[in-house]
Amino acid sequence: MVEKIPMTASGYAALSDELKHRQSVDRPRIIEHIAEARSHGDLSENAEYHAAKEEQSHNEGRINELEDKLARADIIDVSKLSGDTVKFGATVTLIDEDTEKKAVWQIVGEAEADAKKGKISITSPLARALIGKKAGSSVEVVAPGGAKAYEIAKVEWR
């Protein structure tokens, strides 16, 4: 059985956009670079040709990876979720119990996780510690950087 990948609708759209760009913009551009480099003659010592072939290999690998993830996507419409328990798709406001600093994280699938955008993977130590907890609860997260304690201030569905 094929393992489904949980993904938000926006995460699915972002991966679809990347796939379309790689197929319709990057692929033709790389093929053009290969043809141009090939026209320069001897391929054995043609650095431009080898660089273009390497770029092609990288691009095709990413296309295959994106096609696989999109085919296995289990799209979850976060706007239809509710409740005060943390689960996939929840946006959670945390307060660091040591520093009192607030942090807001949305729990998403691995393919769409991006800490800079406030999105953490459901498989991350923080998300695993939060799943099933409610607002007002305290959690301890054991991560590579050491243990941290947080209070769950709010659970939202955006």
From Swiss-Prot:
Belongs to the GreA/GreB family. Keywords: Coiled coil, DNA-binding, Transcription, Transcription regulation. The keyword Hydrolase does not apply. HAMAP family: GreA_GreB. It comes from the Bacteria. It holds the Pfam family GreA_GreB_N. The keyword rRNA-binding does not apply. Residues 47-74 form a coiled coil. GO terms for biological process: DNA-templated transcription elongation; regulation of DNA-templated transcription elongation. Necessary for efficient RNA polymerase transcription elongation past template-encoded arresting sites. The arresting sites in DNA have the property of trapping a certain fraction of elongating RNA polymerases that pass through, resulting in locked ternary complexes. Cleavage of the nascent transcript by cleavage factors such as GreA or GreB allows the resumption of elongation from the new 3'terminus. GreA releases sequences of 2 to 3 nucleotides. The gene is greA. GO terms for molecular function: DNA binding; RNA polymerase binding. This is Transcription elongation factor GreA.
